[in-house]
Amino acid sequence: TNTRSELRQVYADENGNVPSLESPANYFALASNPDSDKFAAIGARMEATLKVDHVSTNAKYHDKPPAYSVVVGQIHAGKLDDLRNDVSGFGWGNEPLKIYYKKYPNHETGTVFWNYELNLPEDNPKRTDIAYPVWGDGWHDDNDPGETGIALGESFSYEINVYGDTMYLTFSAENHPTVKHQINLANNVDANGFIDDYDDPVAYKNDWLFSKLARITNAVRRMPQH
């Protein structure tokens, strides 16, 4: 199972009332969303400074990319039947951002990276996460990052700013280079500047979006047999 502790972004009106999760008034939108005036905000900002003290060391599926990792922040699209169809990813609850820390049990340090999920229907085989390294490499690399990585208990920070249609990401840590990325969330150009033909051409343009500060452990533990 994936154990988790999350703080979900919610909005309140001028009287302190929290709108329904079925209302755009409890989500933010990209600037190019055709109904952007119905949302609580255009764009969003999320910042955190944190330390990861523990990750799973006993993963049943140790060869799977999420093993030995923890999600420490994300932006999520809402799961909404009215938006959902078999052509686009709108309404399927995909994630334009998941920030990971991953450390193998025998490694000195761990890696920090972020993933962008192609915005496609749930049963589309092309729907996958694209990893972008921050310190160390992405989740497919099992080499020890050594001094380039982040140790357990070592502090690092991230700042995520969705402005207009673009998501700006800044990662910083003492004795490590500051790393910046950006990606337009309303087209299918990836964070390296290349067109991704598998992604929806307008990416997350029409989705209802919200942020999460999270600690989600991505490992299925091997349970003892009796």
Enumerate the predicted regions with their spans.
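Surface-exposed coil/turn segments at beta-strand junctions on protein surfaces, enriched
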Residues: F39-A41, G149-G153, V162
